[in-house]
Amino acid sequence: MANKLKVDELRLKLAERGLSTTGVKAVLVERLEEAIAEDTKKEESKSKRKRNSSNDTYESNKLIAIGEFRGMIVKELREEAIKRGLDTTGTKKDLLERLCNDANNVSNAPVKSSNGTDEAEDDNNGFEEEKKEEKIVTATKKGAAVLDQWIPDEIKSQYHVLQRGDDVYDAILNQTNVRDNNNKFFVLQVLESDSKKTYMVYTRWGRVGVKGQSKLDGPYDSWDRAIEIFTNKFNDKTKNYWSDRKEFIPHPKSYTWLEMDYGKEENDSPVNNDIPSSSSEVKPEQSKLDTRVAKFISLICNVSMMAQHMMEIGYNANKLPLGKISKSTISKGYEVLKRISEVIDRYDRTRLEELSGEFYTVIPHDFGFKKMSQFVIDTPQKLKQKIEMVEALGEIELATKLLSVDPGLQDDPLYYHYQQLNCGLTPVGNDSEEFSMVANYMENTHAKTHSGYTVEIAQLFRASRAVEADRFQQFSSSKNRMLLWHGSRLTNWAGILSQGLRIAPPEAPVTGYMFGKGVYFADMFSKSANYCYANTGANDGVLLLCEVALGDMNELLYSDYNADNLPPGKLSTKGVGKTAPNPSEAQTLEDGVVVPLGKPVERSCSKGMLLYNEYIVYNVEQIKMRYVIQVKFNYKH
């Protein structure tokens, strides 16, 4: 029943159906139940039509199947038995009897290449295939790689993806070409029987977001033949040799290989989208953690939430599972965006189309059957959105590695995940001076221009990262240390708390950062709160209050992408805004840290482009987390 699902589960189910995910739980339940009822009605109607027609064809199909079996030689009968998951021992008579009985039970013709069409015909941009509801399917993992979710169950039960040494014969290929309206995938796997006696080659292809067509070649008696077919197909589709894939070179109108992170080989296990189980399945009160901490960990370590957030911003987690994202894929995403940033001001439409296609090839998106021309990355705003997406994927890549041990194997998964963060969280009581100071700072610095929502503190924690305390020591008595806000997507917090705030990598485009690549802070709460990207349907947010050693600041009125090249003697950049907390109302803590919690006042000089101040440091050693604030957004409209 829909009402038994949790809110994040309801949103995920609705997103899978392409329905709105906004609203309170009661609204979500009603929306999902209506959709389920409509689906049931359609299925009943379809089944009724099928029954009326299938009764006439059942016997004829069965006779055709049995007739084909009788014309096969022993080797062909054995191959057919393997495909059906049947015993392959015995004489021709035994095999024939076994297959005929199976035909009587399921009434299907001999299993040949699924859908019967060779992939050379390609996907025709996917327009001839109806887009069906794609559900999250439980995939089967044996060893390093996950068997494709659409491989027949009888094959899954007996086969695994072949691995020889460091070579895992599993490839996901992607090709997006904006001008030709292509957004397609190609899956390629060598399957080895669990008995290691037979081998098959599985392929599936189509437009991103649909099941597509598939083909199963074999079985073969040795892996040599299967590997030959696999490597030839890989070369045919990508114009690269499988043996040289680590130095992969993309070619126009060819597929690109998406590198997967296989990690260490694990025991056979079913996995959901090949990402770790969600901690939200465990009730916080069942953990030995303080209930407040346990609730927070269940929020930020919720993989369903991560998948949902990424789906909402267009990422296709079914094509490149969140748990298998490699660092090289993220780097490639940044590299393409960097090249886009270099031509975006010239507005070279043809080049922007080419580069947008290259980005969507590396970072798969599900656009359904919309025209690809709608999704060209041709404005600074669109570029910024994609940079933020890749940043989020980078944080998720860290988080999924952090949570990679199946919490089901742990007595207390929430406690296990908390330990993995290596960040101490101490709850702060609502009646404490600290809580009052933070609440005051938050309330006073909520800008008038951000009046579409109010925010309340759900939980407040003192944060302690040992590594930060040690490296910050050199700045602990320096002048101009301030307590400043930093907000980020909910998907990012497992990575941030475990690794600290980090600076964008060299391959990221500098144009995505107004004052160069650094860590950005604000003295206005709502400016940072906007970077939580909460909404009416997902109104949880998390922010940091950090002690930041600013030293002498390089004050700028206008953006400067090269501001990270600080003038001699300067330790940080301040983007000067038109409105800022009243400095005369600031509070200084016992250790000398300044808290700019005064009510906003306007600057006498109106020059500049920023509404509010921004503070940027380019050395993470100048940052020390002080508080983690979990908040609830209450939207007025």
Swiss-Prot record:
The keyword Isomerase does not apply. GO terms for molecular function: DNA binding; NAD+ poly-ADP-ribosyltransferase activity; NAD+-protein-aspartate ADP-ribosyltransferase activity; NAD+-protein-glutamate ADP-ribosyltransferase activity; nucleotidyltransferase activity. A motif (Nuclear localization signal) lies at residues 41-62. Pfam families: PARP, PARP_reg, SAP, WGR. One of its GO terms (cellular component) is nucleus. It comes from the Eukaryota. GO terms for biological process: DNA ADP-ribosylation; double-strand break repair via nonhomologous end joining; protein poly-ADP-ribosylation. Residues 286-404 form the PARP alpha-helical domain. Residues 412-637 form the PARP catalytic domain. Residues 35-46 have a biased composition (Basic and acidic residues). Residues 106-117 have a biased composition (Polar residues). InterPro entries: ARTD/PARP, Poly(ADP-ribose)pol_cat_dom, Poly(ADP-ribose)pol_reg_dom, Poly(ADP-ribose)pol_reg_dom_sf, SAP_dom, SAP_dom_sf, WGR_dom_sf, WGR_domain. Its EC number is 2.4.2.30, 2.4.2.-. Keywords: ADP-ribosylation, DNA-binding, Glycosyltransferase, NAD, Nucleotidyltransferase, Nucleus, Repeat, Transferase. Gene3D superfamilies: 3.90.228.10, Poly(ADP-ribose) polymerase, regulatory domain, SAP domain, WGR domain. Belongs to the ARTD/PARP family. This is Poly [ADP-ribose] polymerase 2. It comes from Arabidopsis thaliana (Mouse-ear cress). The gene is PARP2.
